């Protein structure tokens, strides 16, 4: 998914780029980039730590969105092709 296409899609719905959906989208792009980097550089421990931090941030945002608006959460999960949160 191209960032500009998602921005134009989001601008139709909301004007703010600080929305939860946009933040999750940008974290997902960073995660995919770091994952492909780590496939080549397995011992890059600093990048591994950064990846874990970004995963935690995205997980917290998704948990917030699932509590506040379940419909938007489901749409975002399907749009980005990521798994749902594990519930305890």
From Swiss-Prot:
Q: Name one GO biological process term.
A: translation
* Major localization class: plastid
This protein's assembly is summarised as: Part of the 30S ribosomal subunit.
**Lineage: superkingdom:** Eukaryota
Annotated compartments? Plastid, Chloroplast
Family in the record: Belongs to the universal ribosomal protein uS15 family.
Q: List the GO cellular component terms.
A: chloroplast; ribonucleoprotein complex; ribosome
Q: What is the protein's name according to its record?
A: Small ribosomal subunit protein uS15c
InterPro entries per record: Ribosomal_uS15 (IPR000589), Ribosomal_uS15_bac-type (IPR005290), uS15_NS1_RNA-bd_sf (IPR009068)
- Lineage of the native species? Eukaryota, Viridiplantae, Streptophyta, Embryophyta, Tracheophyta
CDD domains for this protein: Ribosomal_S15p_S13e (cd00353)
Q: Which GO terms describe its molecular function?
A: structural constituent of ribosome
